[in-house]
Design a protein with these regions (language model features):
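Active-site lining segments that contact anionic ligands and/or coordinate catalytic metals
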Residues: 10, 19, 44-45, 169-173, ...
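Short, contiguous acidic/charged loop-to-helix segments that flank catalytic cores in large enzymes
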Residues: 85-86, 163-165, 176-183, 223
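N-terminal segments that mediate ammonia production and transfer
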Residues: 1-116, 124-166
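Single conserved hydrophobic/aromatic residue that forms the stacking wall/gate
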Residues: 216-228
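Extended, hydrophobic alpha-helical segments in both membrane/secreted and soluble proteins
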Residues: 109, 116-123, 127, 131, ...
Length: 228
């Protein structure tokens, strides 16, 4: 089997090893239940051939790396590691640091599921406030809210897939953590819903810096549409 990574290293390729076998994946979260251990991360442009008992390097890695930071912010599964950095640890640490610095007076921290939860757990620990699950996600039928091609469907998805819990938010000064703001679809609707369900105050903290450019290969916004 030959495994190759793109020349800029924008997406990961991870090699795993167990007795008598090697495997390649883009998500190291696939390894634990198959008894593989991470052997190495391919560098940008690196190519290897895998045999049952060893790896042969066919092309050395390039020096430049332009990995997509959104892997840690949004796309990545919590147990995956990219370039040796675990997704959940990065999200938790960003929230922890923000909570330690934040001077806002809030009653609890909450996360927009799924990728905002790790940040919110870190924020709660850093701030010294409880974590409340005030919004749950209904996953069977709704995709990610930024991927539909038209605004009407994006708004519908953002509204329908997240279900507020009045018992956990009524009368509270809530601080919500989310991974990023792309078009602002989810943020706008969530804030309104939280007030409608009785929140006293709604504060938001975002893990990702402003998005200023788009990806050309998926249904993300053009330069004109990001909220930033």
């Amino acid at each position: 089997i030959i495994a190759a990574r793109d020349q800029w290293g924008r997406t990961p390729v991870v090699i795993g090893k167990k007795d008598g076998a090697y495997a390649a994946t883009s998500e190291s979260s696939s390894f634990p239940n198959l008894d593989y251990e991470i052997e190495k991360y391919l560098g940008p442009g690196e190519i290897v051939r895998m045999y049952p008992d060893h790896i042969e390097q066919l092309r050395q890695p390039n020096e430049g790396m332009q990995i997509c930071s959104f892997l840690w912010v949004y796309y990545g599964f919590p147990t995956s590691c990219y370039e040796g950095k675990n997704v959940e640890e990065v999200r938790f640490t960003s929230g922890l640091k923000m909570g330690q610095m934040d001077k806002s007076e809030v009653d609890c921290a909450c996360g927009i599921p799924d990728s905002g939860v790790g940040m919110a757990l870190g924020y709660a620990e850093g701030k010294g406030v409880p974590y409340h699950r005030a919004i749950s996600k209904y996953t069977p039928t709704w995709p990610r809210s930024f991927t539909p091609s038209n605004q009407e469907m994006r708004s519908l998805v953002a509204k329908m897939k997240l279900i507020p819990n009045r018992a956990m938010l009524q009368g509270k000064r809530l601080l919500f953590c989310d991974d990023s703001i792309v078009r602002g679809t989810q943020l706008r609707d969530n804030v309104k819903i939280l007030y409608d369900y009785g929140a006293k105050e709604v504060h938001m903290r975002i893990a990702c810096p402003p998005l200023i450019l788009s990806l050309i290969h998926i249904s993300e916004p053009t330069r004109r549409t990001p909220i930033s």
